[in-house]
C-alpha cells in the first residue's frame, strides 16, 4: 500500500462487495425461518383452532384448504364503492361488495418526477391489483357480506365510515376511522349472533396483491435491486422476519401460519412503502401464501365464539403509507423495523438522525449530505492527518527508495530487507494510512443504505440537474467529477514503485467513474465531497510537512 488511491481501491472494493453480498443475501435468505411443519390432512384449513393457543408456532397447511381459494379481483369492477379523501389519502375506495379497500393514493408521494399524480399504494388497476380486505369466516368458510353505506360522520377531526350487513345469521357493523393527518386506519367489527346456537367466527384481515416475482431481479449495477419486496411479520417471540415474494412463490401454494403469541403484525413491504395489518386481539394468528403464481396474500386472523343473541367486537389497525420511523414506532412493537438499513443499521440510524436535523435547518438534502460529510471528516481528522503525514514522509523518501530499487533490482529479497530497514530507520509504517480508510467502510455502507431506504430522500432535489438524490445522476456529471477528484488525489500521493502497478492505477479513476455512475447521486455527492476535503487536507498537511522537514 504505497499510495492513497490504493487504499481507496481497497475501501470501495470491500464496500461494494459487502453491499452486493448483503443485497444478494437479503434476496436469497431474507429470514432465517426455521419452520416446524405439521402433516396436514387433505382438506385441513389453517383456520383450525383459530382461538386455541395449543398450535405449533409455525404451520404449513395444505394448499387445497379454504384459505387457498384464489382472490377474484374482477368482482370489484362493477361493484359500488364509497370514496373518502383525507389530508394524506386521495380517493380511498371502500367496496360495498365485501368492505375491501380497493384503492388508496398517497397525496404527498407522486408516481415519479415527471408524473405528479399521487401514487396508488392500494389499487384495483387490472394486472397490478393490491387490496386490503377483512373477511368474515364461519365454520372455516368465508361468507359473502354485501354491505350498505350508513354514511360518513366527522368527530374530532376524524372521518368515520360505517357499513352494515348480514349473512348466515350474523349482523355485522363495520367502521373505518380515518385520521386526517395519519396513514393508519382503524377498522372495527361488531358481530352479533342472531341464531339460537353458538357460532365460531373468524375475522381475517389480509392483503392480496398481484405481483410478478420474476420481475424483481437482482443486478449488481442497479442500486435499487438491493431493496426488498415481500412479506414481513412480527410476533412476541420473533421480533422481525421477512419472506420475499420470490421465495413464497416456491411453496406450491401452501399457506404458512404463525402464532402471534399475544402481539404481532403482518405486512407487505416494498421500496419506501409498507402496508400492515395490526390485530388488536391477543389470540391472532399470522399467515402468508402464494395463491396462483403471481397473486400473494398475507394477513392476520382472530377467532371468537359468539353465544346466541350476543355480540363480539374485533378490531385492527391498517397502516398503508411511507416507511417513516416516526409514523410506525407507536403503532405496534417492532413495526419500525420495516425501515431496514441492514446489518449496520445502528450507524445508519445515527447518520440519518444527524442528516435529518441538518436538513431541518438548511432545507436541502444535498446540502445536508455535504455537511454530514464535513462533520465525518472533522471527527476523523486526527486519523486522517496521521495518514497524510505518513504519506508525506513516504513521498520524501521516494528518491532513496528509487536508489534502493536500482541497486537491488535483481535481488527482490535483499530489496525487501533494505526497504524494511529504511522504514524502521525513518519510523515510517507504509500501512499506517490504511486505518482511516478502513474506518470509513461502515460509514460508506451505512450512508448507502440511508440514501437507498429513506423515503425522505425519494425524489429529493439538490441543485440544477440533480432532481432525485436517491437515483443516479442522469447526466453522469457527479461521477465524472468524482473520477477527476480521484485523479487529482493520485497526483498528490506517492507513486507506486512498480511501473505496471502505476499503469493500473492510472485507470482506477475511469473504473470507479463507471462503477459510481449507477449509484444514487446522493452517495456520489458524498464521495465527491469526501475526496475534495481529503485533497485539501492532504495538500495542506503535505506542504506543511515538507516545509518543516527539509534537510
From Swiss-Prot:
Biased composition (Polar residues): 33-47
Predominant localisation class: membrane
Any one of the GO BP annotations: protein transport
Gene3D superfamilies given in the database record: 2.70.98.90
Keyword Membrane: yes
Span list, region Disordered: 33-58
Transmembrane segments: 3-23, 361-381, 431-451, 504-524
Cellular localization per UniProt: Cell inner membrane
Recorded topology in the membrane: Multi-pass membrane protein
Superkingdom, natural source: Bacteria
GO cellular component: plasma membrane
Keywords: Cell inner membrane, Cell membrane, Chaperone, Membrane, Protein transport, Transmembrane, Transmembrane helix, Transport
GO MF assignments: membrane insertase activity
Alphabetical list of InterPro entries matching this protein: Membr_insert_YidC (IPR019998), Membr_insert_YidC_N (IPR028053), YidC/ALB3/OXA1/COX18 (IPR001708), YidC/Oxa/ALB_C (IPR028055), YidC_ALB_C (IPR047196), YidC_periplasmic_sf (IPR038221)
Job description of the protein: Required for the insertion and/or proper folding and/or complex formation of integral membrane proteins into the membrane. Involved in integration of membrane proteins that insert both dependently and independently of the Sec translocase complex, as well as at least some lipoproteins. Aids folding of multispanning membrane proteins.
Subunit structure: Interacts with the Sec translocase complex via SecD. Specifically interacts with transmembrane segments of nascent integral membrane proteins during membrane integration.
Protein name: Membrane protein insertase YidC
Biological source species: Francisella tularensis subsp. novicida (strain U112)
Amino acid at each position: 500500500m504505497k499510495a492513497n488511491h490504493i487504499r481507496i481501491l481497497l475501501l470501495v472494493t470491500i464496500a461494494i462487495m459487502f453491499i452486493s453480498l448483503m443485497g444478494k443475501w437479503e434476496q436469497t435468505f431474507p429470514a432465517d425461518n426455521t419452520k416446524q411443519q405439521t402433516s396436514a390432512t387433505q382438506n385441513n384449513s389453517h383456520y383450525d383452532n383459530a382461538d386455541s393457543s395449543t398450535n405449533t408456532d409455525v404451520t404449513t397447511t395444505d394448499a387445497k384448504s379454504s384459505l387457498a381459494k384464489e382472490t377474484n379481483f374482477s368482482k370489484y369492477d362493477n361493484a359500488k364503492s364509497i370514496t373518502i379523501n383525507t389530508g394524506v389519502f386521495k380517493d380511498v375506495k371502500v367496496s360495498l361488495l365485501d368492505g375491501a379497500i380497493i384503492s388508496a393514493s398517497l397525496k404527498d408521494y407522486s408516481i415519479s418526477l415527471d408524473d405528479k399524480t399521487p401514487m396508488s399504494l392500494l389499487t384495483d388497476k387490472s394486472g397490478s391489483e393490491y387490496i386490503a380486505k377483512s373477511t368474515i369466516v364461519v365454520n372455516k368458510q368465508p361468507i359473502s357480506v354485501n354491505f350498505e353505506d350508513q354514511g360518513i360522520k366527522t368527530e374530532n377531526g376524524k372521518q368515520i365510515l360505517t357499513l352494515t350487513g348480514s349473512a348466515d345469521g350474523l349482523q355485522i357493523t363495520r367502521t373505518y376511522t380515518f385520521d386526517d393527518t395519519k396513514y393508519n386506519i382503524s377498522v372495527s367489527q361488531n358481530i352479533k349472533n342472531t341464531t339460537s346456537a353458538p357460532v365460531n367466527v373468524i375475522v381475517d384481515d389480509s392483503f392480496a396483491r398481484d405481483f410478478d416475482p420474476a420481475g424483481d431481479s437482482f443486478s449488481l449495477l442497479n442500486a435499487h435491486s438491493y431493496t426488498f419486496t415481500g412479506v414481513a411479520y412480527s410476533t412476541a417471540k420473533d421480533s422481525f422476519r421477512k419472506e420475499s415474494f420470490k421465495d413464497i412463490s416456491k411453496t406450491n401454494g401452501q399457506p404458512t401460519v404463525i402464532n402471534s403469541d399475544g402481539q404481532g403484525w403482518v405486512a407487505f413491504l416494498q421500496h419506501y412503502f409498507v402496508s400492515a395489518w395490526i390485530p388488536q386481539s391477543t389470540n391472532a394468528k399470522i399467515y402468508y401464501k402464494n395463491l396462483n403464481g403471481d397473486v400473494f396474500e398475507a394477513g392476520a386472523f382472530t377467532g371468537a365464539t359468539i353465544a346466541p343473541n350476543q355480540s363480539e367486537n374485533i378490531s385492527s389497525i391498517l397502516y398503508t403509507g411511507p416507511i417513516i420511523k416516526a409514523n410506525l414506532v407507536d403503532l405496534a412493537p417492532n413495526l419500525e423495523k420495516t425501515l431496514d438499513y441492514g446489518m449496520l443499521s445502528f450507524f445508519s440510524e445515527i447518520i440519518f438522525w444527524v442528516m435529518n436535523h441538518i436538513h431541518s435547518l438548511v432545507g436541502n438534502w444535498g446540502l445536508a449530505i455535504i455537511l454530514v460529510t464535513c462533520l465525518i471528516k472533522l471527527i476523523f481528522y486526527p486519523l486522517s492527518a496521521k495518514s497524510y503525514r505518513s504519506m508525506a514522509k513516504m513521498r520524501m523518501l521516494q528518491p532513496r527508495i528509487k536508489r534502493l530499487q536500482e541497486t537491488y533490482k535483481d535481488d527482490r529479497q535483499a530489496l525487501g530487507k533494505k526497504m524494511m530497514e529504511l522504514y524502521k530507520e525513518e519510523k515510517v509504517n507504509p500501512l499506517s494510512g490504511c486505518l482511516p480508510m478502513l474506518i470509513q467502510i461502515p460509514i460508506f455502507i451505512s450512508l448507502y443504505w440511508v440514501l437507498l431506504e429513506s423515503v425522505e430522500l425519494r425524489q429529493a432535489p439538490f441543485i440544477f440537474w440533480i432532481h432525485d438524490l436517491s437515483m443516479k445522476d442522469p447526466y453522469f456529471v457527479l461521477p465524472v467529477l468524482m473520477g477527476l477528484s480521484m485523479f487529482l488525489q493520485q497526483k498528490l500521493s506517492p507513486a507506486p514503485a512498480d511501473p505496471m502497478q502505476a499503469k493500473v492505477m492510472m485507470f482506477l479513476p475511469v473504473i470507479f467513474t463507471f462503477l459510481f455512475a449507477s449509484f444514487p447521486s446522493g452517495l456520489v455527492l458524498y464521495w465527491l465531497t469526501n475526496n475534495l476535503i481529503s485533497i485539501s487536507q492532504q495538500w495542506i498537511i503535505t506542504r506543511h510537512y515538507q516545509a518543516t522537514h527539509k534537510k
